Amino acid sequence: MNSCFIILAGGESKRFNSNTPKPYTNYKGKPLLLHSIDKAKVFNKFNKIVLVVNKKHKNFIKKLNIKNIRIITGGKTRAESAYNALKSIKENNFKNVIIHDAARPNFSLKLLNKLMNELKLNDCVIPAIQTADTVKQKISNNVKNLKRENIYLIQTPQAFNYKKLFELQNNKSEEVTDDANLFVRAGKKIKIIKGETTNNKITINSDIKFNNLIKFGIGFDVHRLVPNKKLYLGGVKIPSPIGTLGHSDGDPVLHAVTDAILGACSMGDIGEKFSDKNKKFKNIRSTILLSEIIKQTLKKGYLINNLDINIITQKPKIQKYKKQILNCIAKICNISPTQINIKGKTTEKLGVIGKEKAIACEVIASVIKND
């Protein structure tokens, strides 16, 4: 579908009351805005992703090293930021545009899919949930009860026909709190779909809660060392006269990491996912296998919290390559290097590892369930 996903993260975060602006605050294992970016990428139906940021937050955005998305500066208000984003993609001739607030990191891919499907027959589609609370309107010193069945809490992402929305933005006479309001004021039809109660908005600092389910998994792998084979450890090619024997590239570190993550997520093991009886995986790089597992775990709502890795080998010594391995794994898993710890161990020349005939690795992974 010819579509663009816009993420608004250009606010001042005044109500959030923190030295770190809200979009860059750690939430469920990574900066808040990365949740929306990663979900948009995994959804894999957007031709372009646009991130709108506050010009005062350049140092924060630079540290994230975000790639393959367009980053632009927002305006003084949410409406201005949305308009800036729409203008920035005018030449792309997108049919549809999804606009989302970075402050809502908990939307699901299922909700995105519903929005895109409804957009085939509508120009404006928004998710909403009915309030379960009693709602009153204050009038002077009195209050008036409002009918709950008529009260909706509006959420993002919101989906639009790009051309229709851009026309309304160009002709607006006053500011609006969200883009759907432009359709309301113009008397245009709006399609409301059922939102998600978990798709809450992070507004103040106390909204950041780690009330998530943390799960753990253990991974272990060992490979024989033989002549005339390449040696890969943690995705890094290690200079060595001998290498690991395996159906794939024989990387014991990435295999153990993969199994630990699968175990933590209750998703089986690496042998079930990538059978050594399947010729398709013959000599395949383990970086590709781990990348696929990361995509699968993200779709199920799991985020990696921490990896603790023991690489057990007499030779080579791991210290020299530790930083390379750490950065490689962090990149594949889409986490910060600070969430990974790597330790090199020997067996004091005991057993097959001590005799330099094998290399082993054990990993403990912790993950957070993003419900």
From Swiss-Prot:
<dbReference type="Pfam" id="PF02542">
    <property type="entry name" value="YgbB"/>
</dbReference>
<feature type="binding site">
    <location>
        <begin position="269"/>
        <end position="271"/>
    </location>
    <ligand>
        <name>4-CDP-2-C-methyl-D-erythritol 2-phosphate</name>
    </ligand>
</feature>
<dbReference type="GO" id="GO:0008685">
    <property type="term" value="F:2-C-methyl-D-erythritol 2,4-cyclodiphosphate synthase activity"/>
</dbReference>
<dbReference type="InterPro" id="IPR029044">
    <property type="entry name" value="Nucleotide-diphossugar_trans"/>
</dbReference>
<feature type="site" description="Transition state stabilizer">
    <location>
        <position position="15"/>
    </location>
</feature>
<protein>
    <recommendedName>
        <fullName>Bifunctional enzyme IspD/IspF</fullName>
        <ecNumber>2.7.7.60</ecNumber>
        <ecNumber>4.6.1.12</ecNumber>
    </recommendedName>
</protein>
<dbReference type="InterPro" id="IPR001228">
    <property type="entry name" value="IspD"/>
</dbReference>
<keyword id="KW-0479">Metal-binding</keyword>
<comment type="similarity">
    <text>In the N-terminal section; belongs to the IspD/TarI cytidylyltransferase family. IspD subfamily.</text>
</comment>
<dbReference type="GO" id="GO:0050518">
    <property type="term" value="F:2-C-methyl-D-erythritol 4-phosphate cytidylyltransferase activity"/>
</dbReference>
<comment type="function">
    <text>Bifunctional enzyme that catalyzes the formation of 4-diphosphocytidyl-2-C-methyl-D-erythritol from CTP and 2-C-methyl-D-erythritol 4-phosphate (MEP) (IspD), and catalyzes the conversion of 4-diphosphocytidyl-2-C-methyl-D-erythritol 2-phosphate (CDP-ME2P) to 2-C-methyl-D-erythritol 2,4-cyclodiphosphate (ME-CPP) with a corresponding release of cytidine 5-monophosphate (CMP) (IspF).</text>
</comment>
<keyword id="KW-0511">Multifunctional enzyme</keyword>
<feature type="binding site">
    <location>
        <position position="355"/>
    </location>
    <ligand>
        <name>4-CDP-2-C-methyl-D-erythritol 2-phosphate</name>
    </ligand>
</feature>
<keyword id="KW-0808">Transferase</keyword>
<feature type="region of interest" description="2-C-methyl-D-erythritol 2,4-cyclodiphosphate synthase">
    <location>
        <begin position="215"/>
        <end position="371"/>
    </location>
</feature>
<dbReference type="InterPro" id="IPR018294">
    <property type="entry name" value="ISPD_synthase_CS"/>
</dbReference>
<feature type="site" description="Transition state stabilizer">
    <location>
        <position position="346"/>
    </location>
</feature>
<dbReference type="InterPro" id="IPR003526">
    <property type="entry name" value="MECDP_synthase"/>
</dbReference>
<comment type="pathway">
    <text>Isoprenoid biosynthesis; isopentenyl diphosphate biosynthesis via DXP pathway; isopentenyl diphosphate from 1-deoxy-D-xylulose 5-phosphate: step 2/6.</text>
</comment>
<comment type="pathway">
    <text>Isoprenoid biosynthesis; isopentenyl diphosphate biosynthesis via DXP pathway; isopentenyl diphosphate from 1-deoxy-D-xylulose 5-phosphate: step 4/6.</text>
</comment>
<dbReference type="InterPro" id="IPR034683">
    <property type="entry name" value="IspD/TarI"/>
</dbReference>
<feature type="binding site">
    <location>
        <begin position="221"/>
        <end position="223"/>
    </location>
    <ligand>
        <name>4-CDP-2-C-methyl-D-erythritol 2-phosphate</name>
    </ligand>
</feature>
<feature type="binding site">
    <location>
        <position position="255"/>
    </location>
    <ligand>
        <name>a divalent metal cation</name>
    </ligand>
</feature>
<keyword id="KW-0456">Lyase</keyword>
<feature type="binding site">
    <location>
        <position position="221"/>
    </location>
    <ligand>
        <name>a divalent metal cation</name>
    </ligand>
</feature>
<feature type="binding site">
    <location>
        <begin position="247"/>
        <end position="248"/>
    </location>
    <ligand>
        <name>4-CDP-2-C-methyl-D-erythritol 2-phosphate</name>
    </ligand>
</feature>
<dbReference type="GO" id="GO:0016114">
    <property type="term" value="P:terpenoid biosynthetic process"/>
</dbReference>
<keyword id="KW-0548">Nucleotidyltransferase</keyword>
<feature type="binding site">
    <location>
        <position position="223"/>
    </location>
    <ligand>
        <name>a divalent metal cation</name>
    </ligand>
</feature>
<comment type="similarity">
    <text>In the C-terminal section; belongs to the IspF family.</text>
</comment>
<feature type="binding site">
    <location>
        <begin position="274"/>
        <end position="278"/>
    </location>
    <ligand>
        <name>4-CDP-2-C-methyl-D-erythritol 2-phosphate</name>
    </ligand>
</feature>
<dbReference type="GO" id="GO:0046872">
    <property type="term" value="F:metal ion binding"/>
</dbReference>
<feature type="site" description="Positions MEP for the nucleophilic attack">
    <location>
        <position position="148"/>
    </location>
</feature>
<feature type="region of interest" description="2-C-methyl-D-erythritol 4-phosphate cytidylyltransferase">
    <location>
        <begin position="1"/>
        <end position="214"/>
    </location>
</feature>
<dbReference type="Pfam" id="PF01128">
    <property type="entry name" value="IspD"/>
</dbReference>
<dbReference type="InterPro" id="IPR026596">
    <property type="entry name" value="IspD/F"/>
</dbReference>
<feature type="site" description="Positions MEP for the nucleophilic attack">
    <location>
        <position position="201"/>
    </location>
</feature>
<dbReference type="InterPro" id="IPR036571">
    <property type="entry name" value="MECDP_synthase_sf"/>
</dbReference>
<feature type="site" description="Transition state stabilizer">
    <location>
        <position position="247"/>
    </location>
</feature>
<dbReference type="GO" id="GO:0019288">
    <property type="term" value="P:isopentenyl diphosphate biosynthetic process, methylerythritol 4-phosphate pathway"/>
</dbReference>
<dbReference type="InterPro" id="IPR020555">
    <property type="entry name" value="MECDP_synthase_CS"/>
</dbReference>
<keyword id="KW-0414">Isoprene biosynthesis</keyword>
